[in-house]
Amino acid sequence: MAQYKRILLKLSGESLMGGKQYGIDEVRLNEYAAQIKEIAEMGVQIGIVIGGGNIFRGLSGASKGFDRVKGDQMGMLATVINSLALSSALVAQGVNAKVLTAIRMEPIGEFYNKWRAIELLEQGNVVIMSGGTGNPFFTTDTGSSLRGIEIEADVMLKGTRVDGIYTADPEKDPTATKFSDITYDEIYTRGLKVMDLTATTMCKENNLPIIVFDMDTNGNLKKVMSGENIGTLVHN
């Protein structure tokens, strides 16, 4: 039995690269689709937001002389490409999936609104919400917080390449220890970088818990949904 009825799954664009330096690794993409299919079959309503960092990141573009607004718009389009790829992989595995876009671009995807997203979820579709918030200067973490709150998700699952939140970066500090759970206030006081401050504050103020977990290990998404204690739970 699933622990949550409706979730918002946040995936990074970089994670779609798999072992590549750029773009989309089809093996990784299909592994993610298979994991999502597993929990869809449990009856979970699944909203998804994917970043675009495997294709273009607005902030890094700005540091190289791009206009920040144009750079962020390029990043938003990158999230649409990733969303279409994941949608296609899900449909190929027999899962109904719809892409909604924060900026009008029919027929690529329907224009996002909360009520349509919830309607599609309740009809059994995986709903992939692309284009960030539709505005520059907001990260896809903030976009996923916003969408999670709007669709009234029970939890946001942040799929990453590490298995939770640590006292320090475990890839740099071998003495770093993992939290099984942590409060939003403690994240602030410790200065931990789970998401950017805007995204974290939105989740805290709207009482949306986050579970940070390793999405790159097959089967982990189902384990989280089954209530197994993997990853780190962030809560008020």
Swiss-Prot record:
Top-level EC class:
transferase
Give the binding site residues for UMP.
G52, D72, T133, G134, N135, P136, F137, F138, T139, T140
- EC number(s): the record gives 2.7.4.22
Output the Gene Ontology terms for molecular function.
ATP binding; UMP kinase activity
Q: Does the keyword Isomerase apply?
A: no
Q: In which pathway does it act?
A: Pyrimidine metabolism; CTP biosynthesis via de novo pathway; UDP from UMP (UMPK route): step 1/1
- Report the protein's function: Catalyzes the reversible phosphorylation of UMP to UDP.
- Indicate what this protein is called per its UniProt record: Uridylate kinase
Native organism: Parabacteroides distasonis (strain ATCC 8503 / DSM 20701 / CIP 104284 / JCM 5825 / NCTC 11152)
The encoding gene: pyrH
